[in-house]
Amino acid sequence: MTNIKWMDAVLSHDEAGNPIEPEWPEADVIIGNPPFLGGKRMRSELDDAYVDDLFALYQNRVPREADLVTYWFEKARSLIYDGKLERAGLLATNSIRGGANRRVLQRIKETGDIFFAESDRPWILNGAAVRVSMVGFDDGSEGEKMLDGAPADAVNSDLTGALDLTSASRLAENSNLAFMGDTKGGPFDLSPDIARKLLSATGNPNGRPNTDVIRPWVNGLDITRRPRGFHIIDFGTEMSLEDAALYEAPFEYVNEHVRPKREKSRSTRSEWWLHERPRVDMRRALNGMERFIVTPSVAKYRLFAWSSPPTLVDHAAFAFARDDDYFFGVLHSRAHEIWSLRMGTSLEDRPRYTPTTCFETFPLPWPPGGEPEGDVRVEAISEAARRLDELRRRWLDPEGASEPELKKRTLTNLYNARPTWLENAHRALDGAVFEAYGWTSDITDEDILKELLAMNTERSEGGR
């Protein structure tokens, strides 16, 4: 087998040190299991120079946020497009189906076609159970398509064979409403005991309390399970080192626990006392609100809950800058649930939600901010949403419940059991939302998706 080489398959350098694409050995068909590395971990696992060269070489071909495996897909696609390869079959985690990763599959569809796919199947990687996708593609000459072991008319770039939602566009009307939470970039978070100790510390030379810079903190687990009572040290987005040091106990905690890690990274060492990505837009949008909506990024069920300032949302959750029950109700409806399941990706067997693909493409009954004032349909959704939230709160924290009993009362456990009262509350909410859309109560999930896609197309074209 003289045509098998031990080499970097996606990046090489010429004699001057400039990045170039490596030449792959001649072949008719390529079958492979490329290495997996999440896009967010590439700089920490590889070095900055390598990643910068990779980005430069594949600029406008592979999104910078995409996982490492996508570069093998793009390289194989380009060889097929140039007539140097007939077809390829590659394996990736099932996140290839969505987000930035899906762009490489869209390029495959633009210059050729996908003729085979196993969209989501279990796999063992380094002893751990993961979910993978298998994709076979060519120049479009293969007429027979197979998807998940069955014949299909077509295989879409999200590895579905049903209604193709990949054409859905982000709607301008939904912008600046949903935000990824704060990325702390170090152990700024505090357990309840440590938080109490730091909050009670006095004697700051600026005369200010530590509540200025220590806030309640919520991530996905606080939503799906029980609130853990964690706090986080947060010096905001622009506080200087000198001003931060005036909060003596919190600053010394960060100096001891965060600084050593942050100084190892070129990108975070200069402002090691500040969070790595403090999400300025999110903070600005939530400023002055009495409450806001949160949802976990990855969860078995698509759950929404209320939170309130000064709570800081972690990057494992998303915040919505709306405080009204109507908006909460539409998000928690069947319409938004099935749309987000199709538009999102997954982590292992749990759906992953992202604002750009799941929310910003989602057409609400009326463009946000354009809800008709006093409309009975808006009030019906609001009332059903308030009722759902009220019933859930009472179930989560019943009067007189013991601590062991409370530990079992989580939203995940509630939706696992899905008692009749919860089913009835969601049925009432869905009925109100469907009425606002002008749908019948017996509309199928597939027809919901068709209606939403048509609305997305109409609004996106109208906004151009």
Where in the sequence are the language-model features?
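Conserved beta strand-loop-helix elements of the APE1-like EEP
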Residues: 131-144
